[in-house]
Amino acid sequence: MAALLMPRRNKGMRTRLGCLSHKSDSCSDFTAILPDKPNRALNYLRMYKFTATELQESRRLSTEEATRWADSFDVLLSHKYGVAAFRAFLKTEFSEENLEFWLACEEFKKTRSTAKLVSKAHRIFEEFVDVQAPREVNIDFQTREATRKNMQEPSLTCFDQAQGKVHSLMEKDSYPRFLRSKMYLDLLSQSQRRLS
């Protein structure tokens, strides 16, 4: 009964913890973050649902490209495989909602239809910003309330403040950890080995 009273956002964590305690084969959510060959960075890309074409292209990732991800967080976000590698890293920390929100906002800004804009805005708000949202992002009360007010008349800029806060949080917190992670260092190492 107590499990029913837990907030929806804890559902994913409960599933993963349940998988650990029961070692269930049906727990694909959790097995995806346990690489069978932890020394192979490309396995991370496989585990996080890259298509066969994307995997083939990722094998051509140059050392220069992967090294540039360390230049700045925005450089990482501008590179397709940088985003994929960062997403895989965030999944291992159970914090991919920040990147997913940022990406949803970027996609939202491309919306041209007014009717679609309103429905997309409400979907993003309910998924990421609202209190107890399934994938609630970590933003302060003032930002959440300002975004809530923006929902009264959604526009292409209605998430700008919240997106900026999430970007800053990832840049100051998750991004430095990613650059120090074994996963990123393995990607660099593998791309260097392919050149040799």
UniProtKB/Swiss-Prot annotation:
A GO BP entry: positive regulation of GTPase activity
Membrane topology according to the record: Peripheral membrane protein
SUPFAM superfamilies: Regulator of G-protein signaling, RGS
GO cellular component terms, A-Z: cytoplasmic side of plasma membrane; dendrite; neuronal cell body membrane; nucleus; perikaryon; synapse
Domain RGS residues, every copy: 72-188
Sorted UniProt keywords: Cell membrane, Cell projection, GTPase activation, Membrane, Nucleus, Phosphoprotein, Signal transduction inhibitor
Signal sequence interval, chain numbering: none
UniProt xrefs under Pfam families: RGS
Residues that bear Phosphoserine: 26
GO molecular function, one term: GTPase activator activity
Compartments, record wording: Cell membrane; Membrane; Perikaryon; Cell projection, Dendrite
Primary location: membrane
Task performed by this protein: Regulates G protein-coupled receptor signaling cascades, including signaling via muscarinic acetylcholine receptor CHRM2 and dopamine receptor DRD2. Inhibits signal transduction by increasing the GTPase activity of G protein alpha subunits, thereby driving them into their inactive GDP-bound form. Modulates the activity of potassium channels that are activated in response to DRD2 and CHRM2 signaling.
Subunit structure as annotated in this protein's UniProt entry: Interacts with GNAO1 and GNAI3.
Protein name as annotated: Regulator of G-protein signaling 8
Gene that produces this protein: RGS8
